[in-house]
Amino acid sequence: MSFFERYFAALDGPDPYTSLEFVAEDVEFTIQWARGTDGASRQFVGGRGELRAFIDAGDMTGWAHHVLFAGGAGGVEFALGETRRDDGERIGTFLAVTQLDGEGRMLRYMVARSPAIAFEPAPIDAT
């Protein structure tokens, strides 16, 4: 299971604050958030306290993160995924990247989310 699969499972779980266990004390982050397809977006930046406040402000009911692709090398992890309602309807697409510290926690975190584009899942080679 990738870093982001574990992180988002905690964030989307019954206690989203457990996701902070994946976050270094001195984290720096930016979240670029678009609600619609009009090109307007909002940026959230800060450290661990601001990330906690972002969790406080979010309505986590009825939707979750779904990682479509994940990878990494040299302490950098990324994930391409979707936020989806519980009925499977796509809300938006996200691309997340993090640099991990020596303990495997988020040190730098950047994510962009938009409903304006969707990616097709990769075909599965059953041979």
Region annotations inferred by a language model:
Residues 7-8, 22, 29, 54, ...:
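Aromatic side chains
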Residues 17-73:
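A solvent-exposed, acidic/Ser-Thr-rich amphipathic alpha-helical stretch
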Residues 52-127:
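A beta-strand edge to alpha-helix "cap/lid" segment located at domain peripheries
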Residues 1-15:
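Short, aromatic-enriched amphipathic alpha-helices that serve as compact interaction elements
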